[in-house]
Amino acid sequence: MKFAKGHGTENDFVLLCDPPAELRLTGAGVAALCDRRRGLGADGVLRVTAAAAAAAAGVLDRLPDGVAGDDWYMDYRNADGSVAQMCGNGVRVFAHYLRASGLETRDEFVVGSLAGPRPVTVHAADATGADVSVDMGKANTLGGGGEAFEATVGGRRFAGLAVDVGNPHLACLDPELSVDELAALDVAAPVSFDAAQFPDGVNIEVLTAPAAGVVHMRVHERGVGETRSCGTGTVAAVVAALAAAGADTGTLTVRVPGGDVVVTVTDATSYLRGPSVLVAHGEISEEWWQQAQR
């Protein structure tokens, strides 16, 4: 079974090219593949397939709203094997892989996901690196009735803004938090939040106030733990940073441990632009894969 390994600002993925959606992906198999000691190691798995094939194979019960049968489909799994709706860094790496492998020749095309269609623009790409923008759709804030959202990260309590970017986020901006304090925070430790507010779990971002157009952010992803970057999380972070400044739209650079991305929020949608790197291509032992599925 062939694979590729790639990352977007060090949020890393194993890509499995499976256009007919014939590959059996179990939670146990995905978790083993993502394990950094007994597998290849990754924050998640991206199955590269077509939307119609995914629906015909039962990967999807139906095509997500707005996704056409002839669109590409990103079947994304978290490192714990759970199915995820969306991954902004993953979409960029997915689009890069399509171009680098010759499966796609256009600069602009649509990548389908459980969260719906995600139009992408490949500004530049070669076999190793790419610069990709993704139309992430409109990011919606939750709790308009004045509901308070809080989380504990690294033993510290933060208030946050709940944001839906196709998946749930709690973006916690602390105006008193310095860049050095953020760097020292134990984001990898178990987090806590109100499970009644987020029954399916939540991705939690901790961020500084913007300075010179830059927000510093770290993230604890549901089903994974701390990652070096989270694309949808950077969108949520910019929504929160703009809201704290009394704005609904704008552009900010988000600096995560894995690098920089640029997020633009408009009245109608949001855009995520950043790098993708394809690191390796190889083949997974069929015997190992069959054992890992159990």
Swiss-Prot record:
Alphabetical list of InterPro entries matching this protein: DAP_epimerase_AS (IPR018510), DAP_epimerase_DapF (IPR001653)
One Pfam family here: DAP_epimerase
GO CC terms of this entry: cytosol
Reactions catalysed: (2S,6S)-2,6-diaminopimelate = meso-2,6-diaminopimelate
Keyword line: Amino-acid biosynthesis, Cytoplasm, Isomerase, Lysine biosynthesis
Active-site feature positions: C87 (proton donor), C230 (proton acceptor)
Residues engaged in binding substrate: N11, N78, G88, N89, N167, N203, E221, R222, G231, T232
E.C. number(s) listed in UniProt: 5.1.1.7
Sample GO molecular function, one term: diaminopimelate epimerase activity
Compartments where found: Cytoplasm
Site (Could be important to modulate the pK values of the two catalytic cysteine residues): H169, E221
Pathways per UniProt: Amino-acid biosynthesis; L-lysine biosynthesis via DAP pathway; DL-2,6-diaminopimelate from LL-2,6-diaminopimelate: step 1/1
GO BP of this protein: lysine biosynthetic process via diaminopimelate
Subunit structure: Homodimer.
Similarity section: Belongs to the diaminopimelate epimerase family.
PANTHER family: DIAMINOPIMELATE EPIMERASE, DIAMINOPIMELATE EPIMERASE, CHLOROPLASTIC
Physiological role: Catalyzes the stereoinversion of LL-2,6-diaminopimelate (L,L-DAP) to meso-diaminopimelate (meso-DAP), a precursor of L-lysine and an essential component of the bacterial peptidoglycan.
This protein's name: Diaminopimelate epimerase
Native source organism of the sequence: Mycolicibacterium paratuberculosis (strain ATCC BAA-968 / K-10)
Protein's gene: dapF
